[in-house]
UniProtKB/Swiss-Prot annotation:
UniProt entry tagged with the keyword Protein biosynthesis: yes
Pfam families xrefs: Amidase (PF01425)
GO biological process, one term: translation
Family in the record: Belongs to the amidase family. GatA subfamily.
Coiled-coil intervals, chain numbering: none
Catalytic residues as annotated in Swiss-Prot or TrEMBL: 109, 184, 208
InterPro entries: Amidase (IPR000120), Amidase_CS (IPR020556), Amidase_dom (IPR023631), AS_sf (IPR036928), GatA (IPR004412)
Protein name: Glutamyl-tRNA(Gln) amidotransferase subunit A
Gene3D superfamilies: Amidase signature (AS) domain (3.90.1300.10)
Biological role stated in the UniProt entry: Allows the formation of correctly charged Gln-tRNA(Gln) through the transamidation of misacylated Glu-tRNA(Gln) in organisms which lack glutaminyl-tRNA synthetase. The reaction takes place in the presence of glutamine and ATP through an activated gamma-phospho-Glu-tRNA(Gln).
Length: 524
């Protein structure tokens, strides 16, 4: 028996004309706005059943009540949030045509430039810095009239897998406050998981959207490289960095993806011709189901723990019973991908972070000379993980090691791309567990760097190849959510949404299992 996701049944009925034009039947009982998906909130705002300001206040209340425990946000500006919400309500009164997500609040990762709001990339070297302009994606959500709630916590400059390397605070997992929310963008996914925000923006270099989604039981999408503008996004590794949506369900992610995607001449790798019908793909996937879809998979037993491996196997059997066509595929260079990624990423990061000299922006630690000021500022204000990766990256690019390390990693990158090309000649999408383990205990891996880096084992291959990939909830193990990763060919992001929506229908909503007796830690 398929457990249908309620919101997709609701949307299906709406599309069949069985509901009023407002899209939803009258509510019965208490309305909890902060627990509703973004697409439903948007419909309620458009139909004027609730105001955008009421929706904003609901999430503001949640942030004020819970963020002292979760630590998802680095900065909030609720006056701005309320001002945008009021503007939406006024425009609705005048029958102004608004975007599908108008009035729906959003949180933004601190890697993304926001004019008039601090942007620090989770680092003390940018403490208090307020950018003079918005990133392209911020301009687009502003035009869509989406109120920004604030900036979310992250590992410093995106370097980490647990948000423990933030210079300001450690984000905690809403499922169990003793565990990580993932990284680097743990703040965005934790905010969505804790109902502090219905939507969030993240950035994904080697898995920084997908890994937090896995840890927090949310949806996180890495778009095709070049499909969402990087202009105004603080660079970690320029050949990998992508902005993407974080949400509680596939449809919401698709709607947000449509807002932020599209060509931008300010980004040198921006793709001109794109198919942006992601929400339509989600609708069609939910209606059509998984039958006939060719699902590739790789046996994860040599890199995943046994419980995730078993759950992945059961999930594949469930999908096969619903008509999916399974293919176990060969991925010869899978085991080398994470190593190649870290070599290239650290090399690019050492170059990108050389611009933080304290002269142009950020606070200064004064010394007797200009060079001394630069050296002192970088020594004091960069965190230990950032320093470690800058040193490694500089070493990788140095004479005598460039060919052995950097060029060898680039050769592996090419081989990974070829592996994917062969895989997608046989299947429509590739499925993998998103990570080797459920969310680990805070402090467990912070001094075990190799173990921390291995958290990215399954997410780095898609990053190397520039492919679209998303993590959706696969189930719960010992009270903790785990994710299923869907990877599609380049510029076929719609397959992530259609397949994800179909699988989401079969797996059902895992959030009813939150705060169960299996959860041994304090919960939010």
């Amino acid at each position: 028996m398929i457990r249908r996701a309620p919101f997709l049944i609701l949307l299906r009925f709406c599309r069949m004309g069985k509901m009023a034009c407002s899209g939803y039947p009258p509510f019965q009982g208490r309305i909890v706005l902060s627990e509703m998906p973004a697409h439903r909130l948007a419909a309620l705002i458009r139909s004027k059943e609730v105001s955008a300001l009421e929706v904003a206040e609901s999430f503001i209340d949640n942030i004020e009540a819970s963020d002292s425990r979760i630590c998802a946000f680095l900065y909030t500006d609720f006056s701005y949030t309320r001002d945008v919400a009021r503007r939406v309500d006024e425009e609705l009164k005048s029958a102004t045509k608004l975007s599908p997500l108008a009035g729906v609040p959003i949180a933004v990762k601190d890697m993304i430039l926001t004019r008039d709001m601090p942007t620090t990339a989770g680092s003390k070297i940018l403490e208090g810095w307020i950018p003079p302009y918005n990133a392209t994606v911020i301009e687009r959500i502003s035009r869509a009239r989406m109120p920004i709630l604030g900036k979310t916590n992250q590992d410093e400059f995106g370097m980490g897998s647990s948000t423990e390397y933030s210079a300001y605070k450690t984000t905690r997992n809403p499922w169990d406050l003793s565990r990580t929310a993932g990284g680097s963008g743990g703040g965005s996914s934790a905010a969505v998981s804790a109902s502090q925000a219905p939507l969030a923006l993240g950035t994904d270099t080697g898995g920084s959207i997908r890994l937090p989604a896995h840890c927090t039981g949310t949806v996180g999408i890495r778009p095709t490289y070049g499909s969402v503008s990087r202009y105004g996004v603080i660079a970690l590794a320029s050949s990998f960095d992508q902005v993407g949506p974080c949400s509680s369900n596939i449809l919401d992610a698709a709607l947000l993806h449509e807002v932020i995607a599209g060509y931008d001449p300010a980004d040198a790798v921006s793709i001109k011709d794109q198919d942006l019908n992601f929400s339509q793909a989600a609708y069609e996937g939910a209606n059509r189901g998984i039958s006939g879809v060719r699902l590739g998979f790789v046996n994860p037993s040599n890199w995943c723990n046994s419980k995730i491996t078993d759950l992945f196997g059961r999930t594949l059997k469930s999908l096969e019973s619903e008509g999916a066509v399974l293919h176990e595929v060969q991925f010869p260079n899978f085991d080398h991908a994470v190593q190649a990624y870290y070599l290239i990423m650290q090399a690019e990061a050492s170059s990108n972070l050389s611009r933080y000299d304290s002269i142009r922006f950020g606070p200064q630690e004064m010394a007797a000379s200009a060079s001394g000021t630069v050296s002192k500022t970088r020594s004091i204000r960069f965190g230990p993980e950032v320093k470690r990766r800058i040193l490694l990256g500089t070493h990788i690019l140095s004479a005598g090691y460039y060919d052995d390390f950097y060029m060898s990693a680039q050769k592996i990158r090419l081989l990974v791309k070829r592996d994917f090309a062969k895989i997608f000649s046989l299947v429509d999408v590739l499925l993998l567990p998103t990570a080797p383990t459920p969310a680990f205990k805070l402090g467990e891996k912070i001094d075990h760097h190799t173990s921390m880096y291995k958290s990215d084992t399954a997410t780095t291959p898609a990053s190397l190849a520039g492919l679209p990939a998303g993590s959706i909830p696969m189930g719960v193990i010992d009270g903790l959510p785990v994710g299923l990763q869907i990877i599609a060919p380049g510029q076929f992001d719609s397959r992530v949404y259609s397949t994800g929506a179909a699988i989401e229908q079969i797996i059902g909503d895992i959030h009813a299992m939150k705060n169960t007796k299996h959860n041994t830690g304090q919960t939010a």
